[in-house]
Regions:
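A short acidic, leucine-rich amphipathic alpha-helix
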Residues: 27-29, 109, 120-127
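Beta-hairpin "wing" of winged helix-turn-helix
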Residues: 48-57, 64, 144-152
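Short amphipathic alpha-helical interface segments
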Residues: 11-21, 98-118
Length: 174
């Protein structure tokens, strides 16, 4: 889901759908400057992650924000995305929040640190990652506000931003 959110065109589509759910693929394509085919592909990716849903009216396909079929862990991400886009948070800020969680190893590190604050050495012992890989992922998590270094250990932080906060909660509760 984070990889899908971390894309400027898809965020633009989400924002357009929030503003006017009556637009079809052709309208959305014209609005963001992509071909209808490329726009359709981006919309399908958003549908596949339950961030939007498609509704057919005759031959025309319209999209609305959210999906009644979304699994429970997606609902907070839908709400956070909607809040972020509704208040005009810049796409790059939303993308930065999402990219903290675009790699499974960063998600695992957030979960491990949530159970017990840890040093890099302790994380190496608990995982199948090298110290250099852990350090690289921790740097990204720290830069995006997901972890902090305190008392010689990494601790989970309360990241700023609607999406980062929702992602952190979903990951820790998983």
């Amino acid at each position: 889901t984070c990889r899908v959110i971390a894309n400027e065109n898809r965020l633009h589509l989400l924002q357009l759908i929030l503003k006017d759910p009556t637009q079809c693929v052709k309208d959305l394509a014209a609005e963001i400057g992509l071909t209808p085919s490329a726009t359709s592909t981006q919309l399908k990716r958003l549908c596949d992650e339950y961030l939007i849903s498609a509704h057919r009216t005759g031959l025309t396909l319209h999209y609305s924000f959210g999906s009644e079929y979304a699994p429970p862990h997606i609902l907070p991400l839908q709400a956070a995305s909607k809040r972020s886009l509704s208040v005009g948070i810049p796409y790059q800020s939303i993308i930065r929040q999402a990219t903290g969680c675009t790699h499974q190893r960063r998600i695992e590190l957030i979960q491990r640190i949530a159970t017990a604050p840890s040093s890099i050495e302790e994380l190496v012992q608990k995982s199948r990652m090298s110290s250099s890989a852990i350090a690289r992922h921790i740097r990204k998590l720290k830069a995006r506000g997901y972890v902090v270094f305190k008392d010689s250990r990494y601790h989970n932080a309360k990241p700023a931003g609607h999406l980062a906060s929702a992602l952190s909660k979903v990951i820790i509760q998983a």
